[in-house]
């Protein structure tokens, strides 16, 4: 066997030429202890706060506590297969999620992984979950209405695009139902061609039963609303870090639309459960507890989340992100820690009360305690004209009703006021999944505030409303179209509307 020296030297030269000198360096640490969804890791000296780390079995976690000799990591998954002594490696990336139009119509977990069995998500880009909210200069004051389709809200507590309006109440008072109706009401706008009228919806379910989330998705699907919605679900069986992260992930998905000159609505259902999950994580990380055992930065947790809802100025694309956070109270106690925090952060609140709910007033909005700090800036001119009166009349009615309990001999004016108030209260009731368009609400409220219901028994108000709407939809579509396109109630429209309502009221028996 002969050895060719030239050939060997050529092979060696080729090998040397193709030799790659890039060695991949990954910083790894070791698990010191693990339990209750928290791992203590030694050796990750350069890890960043909020950075994703990966355990041996592929489960991911987030570095939250950076201490002198170890790192406190919260685990996004089960900690059963993580053992003491296992290696943990840095990923070099702060926690991020996929964002873009590809997520519409899908159900994802807090990390943006699909959980609806419809295959992988074709996302456009990834975005960090916890980013800084827009400053003062890029913002613009809220001035466009965000119609919910609920008379009680659109007339009395108007919500604008870019606003944060809290929905607060005890369990089983219809908080989710209000948010669901607001999502369903965007269907006609999203099916139209006007891009500026479209409103994409993100629903974040935190700590809810899986059956509840499945039911919610089913209702959206049946009503054709899933195609413009994203569902982010961190259910009751998910680890606390996932429940803590879900609202931030949903917010990042909503911000994609806001920053690309589109409009989005995000519902956090609910932030009390997120605060409880954050409290659990903080106590397990040995952070000092404060009031009600919540950590000291629980206010900052919610404020940095809700400040990201904004209306941007024209130079920044004029997009918007509207937030409807939900808070569940215990026995109507709105002076507890989390409710007071979120009330002070948001631009108004919708109070839902158990008593009203059981009296059959649904949506069970307490009009006296509810407020929108944006006010009529978020209403169309047409709605302003008819709804201005209803606020005053209902306020007087509530005042008089309190006194009327004590005396039976009331003068005619007071009796008239009480009769009008009870009929207006009846008029503001609305069945679920039946949102009304703005122009239809204007017609109904016009009839109420101008005394056309006063002669009717209260039990007949609903029938009157249904009949009037059916008449206007079938025979007077042009009037509805005029109000819709002009967003105003001109003198001519008012005269036409008056004639229609008068004729209908005479014939209604």
Curated annotation (Swiss-Prot):
Q: How does it sit in the membrane?
A: Peripheral membrane protein
Residues annotated to bind ATP:
169-176
**Localization:** Cell inner membrane
What this protein is called in its record is ATP synthase subunit alpha
**The UniProt record lists the keyword Calcium:** no
Q: Report if keyword Transport is assigned.
A: yes
Q: Which organism is it from?
A: Methylocella silvestris (strain DSM 15510 / CIP 108128 / LMG 27833 / NCIMB 13906 / BL2)
Q: Its catalytic activity?
A: ATP + H2O + 4 H(+)(in) = ADP + phosphate + 5 H(+)(out)
Q: What is its EC number?
A: 7.1.2.2
**Assembly information from the UniProt record:** F-type ATPases have 2 components, CF(1) - the catalytic core - and CF(0) - the membrane proton channel. CF(1) has five subunits: alpha(3), beta(3), gamma(1), delta(1), epsilon(1). CF(0) has three main subunits: a(1), b(2) and c(9-12). The alpha and beta chains form an alternating ring which encloses part of the gamma chain. CF(1) is attached to CF(0) by a central stalk formed by the gamma and epsilon chains, while a peripheral stalk is formed by the delta and b chains.
Q: Which Gene3D superfamilies match?
A: 2.40.30.20, ATP synthase alpha/beta chain, C-terminal domain, P-loop containing nucleotide triphosphate hydrolases
GO molecular function per UniProt: ADP binding; ATP binding; proton-transporting ATP synthase activity, rotational mechanism
Give the similarity note.
Answer: Belongs to the ATPase alpha/beta chains family.
* Stated role: Produces ATP from ADP in the presence of a proton gradient across the membrane. The alpha chain is a regulatory subunit.
- Check the record and name the PROSITE patterns matching this protein: ATPASE_ALPHA_BETA
Keyword terms of this UniProt record: ATP synthesis, ATP-binding, Cell inner membrane, Cell membrane, CF(1), Hydrogen ion transport, Ion transport, Membrane, Nucleotide-binding, Translocase, Transport
Question: In chain numbering, where does the site feature Required for activity fall?
Answer: 370
GO cellular component assignments: plasma membrane; proton-transporting ATP synthase complex
Q: Which gene holds the coding sequence for this protein?
A: atpA
